[in-house]
């Protein structure tokens, strides 16, 4: 399955919430009818079955993190294998992706941009270049912008935008040095309350 390359806001309208695929910190309501699905009959909201609700939630989370179906299923299998709550384990694994950490630290305005920075070798982990977006960042890892990439205007602009976002408490960022530390594994209370991971577990448990 290929990565979706169409209009980003259409996906947010499909899910009925801002997926932060393109909007950064700006209110998405000012740009599109977020409560209306795309298409001629978007204003009509069909009543979803239990399966439909579970599928929509899975699609929403998958799109937030920019992950393909096969990757997402593998994350679920890993989360299920680990001790503890499967749904919470899933979110922790997704939050630990390098592209997500780069976004959370403010080096990129969106996760898609963060993925591009990683792929283009603009990011180092513990002093070594890592160009794999799915790389799992561990506690105490130091994630930084590569020295020769620090002059990129988009990174500087992203750091300015990040000042308007809520700062993750599990990360420690030095914006001046363009580096940060993954201090601890995030707890469920640290993450979005707009995600119902239990629906995803129910979907894959069938």
UniProtKB/Swiss-Prot annotation:
One of its GO terms (molecular function) is rRNA binding. GO terms for biological process: ribosomal small subunit biogenesis; translation. Residues 96-156 form the S4 RNA-binding domain. It holds the Pfam family S4. Keywords: Ribonucleoprotein, Ribosomal protein, RNA-binding, rRNA-binding. InterPro entries: Ribosomal_uS4 (IPR022801), Ribosomal_uS4_bac-type (IPR005709), Ribosomal_uS4_CS (IPR018079), Ribosomal_uS4_N (IPR001912), S4_RNA-bd (IPR002942), S4_RNA-bd_sf (IPR036986). GO terms for cellular component: small ribosomal subunit. Disulfide bonds: none annotated. Coiled coil: none annotated. It comes from the Bacteria. Part of the 30S ribosomal subunit. Contacts protein S5. The interaction surface between S4 and S5 is involved in control of translational fidelity. One of the primary rRNA binding proteins, it binds directly to 16S rRNA where it nucleates assembly of the body of the 30S subunit. Belongs to the universal ribosomal protein uS4 family. PANTHER family: 30S 40S RIBOSOMAL PROTEIN (PTHR11831), SMALL RIBOSOMAL SUBUNIT PROTEIN US4M (PTHR11831:SF4). This is Small ribosomal subunit protein uS4. The gene is rpsD.
């Amino acid at each position: 399955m290929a990565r979706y390359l169409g209009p980003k806001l259409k996906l947010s309208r499909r899910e009925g919430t801002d997926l932060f695929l393109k909007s950064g910190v700006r209110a998405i309501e000012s740009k599109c009818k977020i409560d209306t699905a795309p298409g001629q009959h978007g204003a009509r909201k069909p009543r979803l079955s239990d399966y439909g609700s579970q599928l929509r939630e899975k699609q929403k989370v998958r799109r937030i993190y920019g992950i393909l179906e096969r990757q997402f299923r593998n994350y679920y299998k890993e989360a299920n294998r680990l001790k503890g709550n499967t749904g919470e384990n899933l979110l922790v694994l997704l939050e630990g992706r390098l592209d997500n950490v780069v976004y959370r630290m403010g080096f990129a305005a969106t996760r898609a941009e963060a993925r591009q920075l990683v792929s283009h070798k603009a990011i180092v982990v513990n002093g070594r270049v890592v160009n794999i977006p799915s790389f799992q960042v561990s506690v105490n890892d130091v994630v930084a912008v590569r020295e020769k990439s620090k002059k990129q205007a988009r990174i500087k602009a992203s750091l300015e935008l990040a000042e308007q976002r809520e700062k993750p408490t599990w990360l420690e960022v030095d914006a001046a040095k363009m580096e940060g530390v993954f201090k601890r594994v995030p707890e469920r209370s640290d993450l979005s309350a707009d995600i119902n991971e239990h629906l995803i577990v129910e979907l894959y448990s069938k």
